[in-house]
């Protein structure tokens, strides 16, 4: 029964995305044009030991095609141990719209530095930008275009991997590209689940009405999105407002990142379990439950697998009927093959939507992603559940 449940959930999610793509088109997804009168925007950049990196971020911000009299950049230093503050000060002397603030609440995490910056922000819109992320020239203009609709309370960007080189970075480049389209499709259902740290823009009233980023969360950009969904705040998503972000280049660094994401996600599911309800529309009856089921499904499969290893039993369910493979295909084989083909179709369609000169997504990379990434995800979840079981403290 377990393999049929896994197959059903996977098939449902894949078909859902394909149907959304069919509904809203594959050639182009229209995005609003920037307003004639641009709003004043505050960009908050939290930094900690980012010497040699934050300068590149500030250069990208300065190069943006956005009136500097409509812009303020607030860099919040979380008591860096290196020369990050001195590097930022060089920019504050040259550019009047850039200022440096020292965070007094150090040691709490990235969300604390963001909150400090937000308290000093004067903009009608507040953007949060990671210190290792580089927005394109037109990114901010494209994102502010969404706020011409008074019901829109936040907008997310098109996050891409910055200059991927080795295989680990290339795999993430494909993953990020697929996520871009997935998040856009979820916005049509009013079901965006995260406002990514690399670049997201909020109305200032979001923080006035709902409070600051949760300093107790290790995945604060997802927590704030859930909080917005809980209050029926609309989140839009752009597939052309590009921001490039540094991605882990080593497997252990990637592992630590994904453990934090997974454990933070589990806590957010638990915190907002009340939202598993018709009251919250597609987000409450489909997207949130499916995310939770996916995590629990991985846990059950892994638990069953390790149980068979310990007991020495033959686990036919986990192997998807491998023994019967030699005697003929069973139902599970057919369903598994269908899921694989639909997944391939989904990724190819997603590639078509966002493929451009910004980044090459060759079919070779896609094939490598399809082969290697499921194994990596399994490893990430094994490590996640092990840390949860032993109660290891998770820091940002």
Which residue stretches match the model-derived regions?
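Membrane-embedded multi-pass helical conduit in multi-pass membrane proteins
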Residues: 33-35, 294-390
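A conserved acidic beta->alpha catalytic loop
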Residues: 68, 77-86, 105-107
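Acidic helix N-cap motif at the loop->helix transition within catalytic regions
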Residues: 55, 82-90, 138
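Catalytic donor-sugar/metal-binding loop of nucleotide-sugar-dependent glycosyltransferases
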Residues: 225-243
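Cell-envelope/extracellular polymer assembly enzymes that use nucleotide-activated donors
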Residues: 39-42, 72, 208, 223
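Long helical/loop segments within the catalytic core of UDP-sugar-dependent glycosyltransferases
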Residues: 101-102, 109-113, 117, 123-124, ...
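Short, acidic, metal-binding catalytic loop of nucleotide-sugar glycosyltransferases
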Residues: 59-70
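N-terminal membrane-anchoring/stem segments of glycan-assembly enzymes
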Residues: 1-37, 351, 377-380, 384-388
């Amino acid at each position: 029964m377990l393999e049929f449940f896994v197959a059903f959930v996977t098939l449902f999610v894949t078909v859902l995305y394909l149907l959304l793509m069919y509904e809203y088109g594959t050639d182009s997804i229209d995005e609003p044009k920037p307003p004639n009168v641009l709003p004043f925007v505050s960009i908050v950049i939290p930094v900690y030991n980012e010497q040699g990196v934050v300068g590149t971020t500030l250069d990208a911000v300065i190069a943006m095609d956005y009136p500097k009299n409509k812009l303020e950049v607030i860099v919040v230093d979380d008591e860096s141990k290196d020369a990050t503050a001195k590097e930022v000060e060089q920019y504050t002397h040259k550019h009047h719209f850039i200022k440096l603030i020292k965070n007094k609440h150090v040691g709490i995490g990235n969300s604390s530095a963001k909150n400090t910056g937000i308290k000093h922000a004067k903009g009608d819109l507040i953007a949060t930008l990671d210190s290792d992320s580089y927005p394109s020239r037109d990114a901010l203009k494209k994102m502010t275009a969404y706020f011409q609709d008074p019901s829109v309370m936040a907008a997310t960007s098109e996050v891409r991997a910055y200059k991927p080189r080795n295989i680990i970075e290339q795999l993430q480049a494909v993953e990020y590209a697929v996520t871009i389209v997935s998040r856009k499709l979820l916005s049509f259902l009013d079901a965006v689940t995260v406002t990514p740290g690399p670049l997201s823009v909020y109305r200032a009233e979001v923080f006035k009405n709902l409070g600051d980023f949760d300093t107790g969360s290790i995945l604060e950009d997802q927590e704030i999105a859930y909080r917005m969904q809980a209050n029926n705040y609309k989140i839009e998503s752009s597939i052309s407002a590009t921001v490039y972000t540094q991605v882990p280049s080593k497997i252990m660094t990637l592992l630590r990142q994904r453990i934090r994401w997974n454990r933070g996600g589990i806590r957010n599911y638990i915190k907002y379990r009340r939202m598993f309800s018709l009251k919250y529309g597609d987000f409450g009856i489909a997207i949130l439950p499916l995310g939770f089921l996916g995590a629990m499904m991985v846990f059950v499969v892994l638990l069953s697998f390790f149980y068979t290893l310990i007991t020495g039993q033959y686990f036919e369910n986990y192997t998807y009927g491998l023994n019967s493979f030699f005697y003929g295909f069973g139902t599970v084989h057919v369903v598994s093959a269908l899921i694989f083909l639909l997944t391939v179709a989904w990724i190819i369609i997603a590639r078509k939507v966002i493929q451009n000169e910004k980044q090459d997504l060759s079919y070779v990379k896609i094939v490598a992603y399809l082969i290697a990434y499921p194994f990596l995800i399994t490893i990430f979840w094994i490590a996640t559940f092990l840390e949860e079981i032993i109660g290891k403290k998770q820091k940002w």
